Amino acid sequence: AVHVHAVTKGLEQVLVAAILQVTAAEMPIAYFTVGHGEDTDITGDVAALYTMVYEAGYDVRPIDLSKEDIDPNARLIIINEPRFDFGGYVDESVGLSEIEKLDAFLDGLGSLMVFIDPDHGSKLTNLNEFLYEWGIEFEYDLRIKDAENSISIDGFSVVGQYNTNTTELAHSVYEQITSLASQPKTIFRNACPIKHTYEDNTRVVDFDSRVISDVFYTSDSAEVYRDSELVGTGRYSLMTITQEQRIINNNDYFSYVLATGTKNYTASQYLLSNIYANSDVLYACMRAFGKERIPADIDFKTYNDYDLDITTAQANSWTRFFMIVPATIIVITSIYVTVRRKYK
């Protein structure tokens, strides 16, 4: 059964990619940032993530935000395990910084996925400040142990608990997964907890509404450690999604930021496994990110000229034609069939 599920999932993703290539004027672009120590070896472990994004229907490209501008056709930017910081806000006279480009991209209804290695996260000052404004604060000095929900003996390979609150954004993203009688496991290895920076999980920014929701969290009995010392117990956030709602011409538009504090979430051992749902969740998120967008700009024409451009005589001639010709064809066909049968 597991094998069938994996094959079906793969076929679905390939089919979606093929449909998008045929129907879209241009395939939407998904960028992977480079220039911050990210793993760019597409023949190595990151290949699974690149392939998954491509099979979701994206044109996958690298981008160095310090040198390149974001293509208007881009829908998604992925920051995967950076070790060095992004350029922060600068004087306008020298152009847009990397953070400012990310900000403008999200303002333009793009979406962002952030996978942070907590061992290097504390050095990402500018990126952390940017994510703070989206309700996300990583507690890099802590590691989560959830012995009650772990696939490893040490308790640090945490099985994330799905958000079952039907009123929250995260639940709607992967509702098809949580509707199963038994949900597949999603793994967070050596993860740090995420704090919400919004009071009541909402904030208004420049008249736009933002809301943050836990995509996954631990059990209520999870523990957090600092340098092998137990410093807290309770339920902790493993992955969050923030949605910004913008009203344009009385229509709602959305941008998203997905974040998790573990370098292992996108590891090939989890993305390629038939056992775990890490890839299924990311795929569900990407579909949610893109559903407010129209994949192809197909022009349509409204026909509002209802006047007849023929005379009455012409109309009568066409009427006689459609009354006589079909009847004549039927008679001739009947005669032909009768003769054939008689002399057969």
Residue map of PLM features:
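Short, surface-exposed patches at the edges or C-terminal ends of soluble domains, predominantly
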Residues: 1-344
